[in-house]
């Protein structure tokens, strides 16, 4: 092999170090702690603000929580958004939407053997006004397709939320998809 033990990007510069020791010459920067957004907590904390809004996308992440955390399925502003969360107190998951400031919340029971405090995979597929919700790689229990959950023409961005300030998120992926709202096959 090539015996490379460090490959790092610092800003837009790639650094590749070979086998190193305490006296090896070269640039050896100290690693930094990972950060998310870096903008501090606001009403929209956890929203992916630096990405392109869309009406068709896939957003998925792992979430480890004791309850009170989940994903923001759609965010335009504080009065126009949708949350998919896990609720340990009621052993359920929910879809909470605000459209024009009007709130709607639907809750669905989780299986009896659902474990809290371990990673669960949440996947949101948005196509226009339709949201499809997947939990641990299968359709969310109770209901997983919400045909008119959000306004079809209102672009937005996804994100994560944590009401308990103790949840962990891993491997968030945001992929803008083909907007087929106006096409019928």
Model-predicted regions and their roles:
Residues 1-185:
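Extracellular glycan-recognition regions
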